[in-house]
Amino acid sequence: MPESLDIVHYVDEHFGEKILSEQVRPEIEAWLKEVGSYYGHLTTARFTQIGLAEFETQSAIDYFTKKKTEFIGDFAENIAKTETYLARLKGDLEKLAALIQSGNALSGKLSLEDIIVFPVLRNLTCVKGIEFPPAVLAYITNMAKLSNVPLYFDKAI
């Protein structure tokens, strides 16, 4: 992600008026660290199964699976542990809901928090059974509209 953030910084600074706050609250950093410790176990194995263009060929699926299992373990085992991860995520999503200050931006103003957190939440929409708190669901939906990025609810497994 560091390279992606470098691109975000460059575009924000060089094209038009700067709009992103660089502030990331410590509570958001802590939330990302906690959820980041396990969310790949929920999402990664599903990516090859939800019809994404990057996985149209078996060779792409095989390569991705080989590389990612080195980090998260067997895909089938991760899928089998979904309920365990969902139980953990439920509390973490409730913590995030308490930190959301606006449906259009976590801190009330578009910031790096949104650039970092929205992709995590978007990826979680590929997991069937997640109960997003209303504030989190509103945020995900609004950010998807603002960024013109589709969510995976209709493909969730």
Go through each PLM region and give its residues.
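Alpha-helical oligomerization segments
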Residues: 130, 138-157
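GST-like domain detector, emphasizing the conserved glutathione-binding G-site
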Residues: 1-63
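GST-like fold's C-terminal all-alpha helical module
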Residues: 35-141
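Short, hydrophobic secondary-structure boundary micro-motifs
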Residues: 19-23, 106-109, 151-155
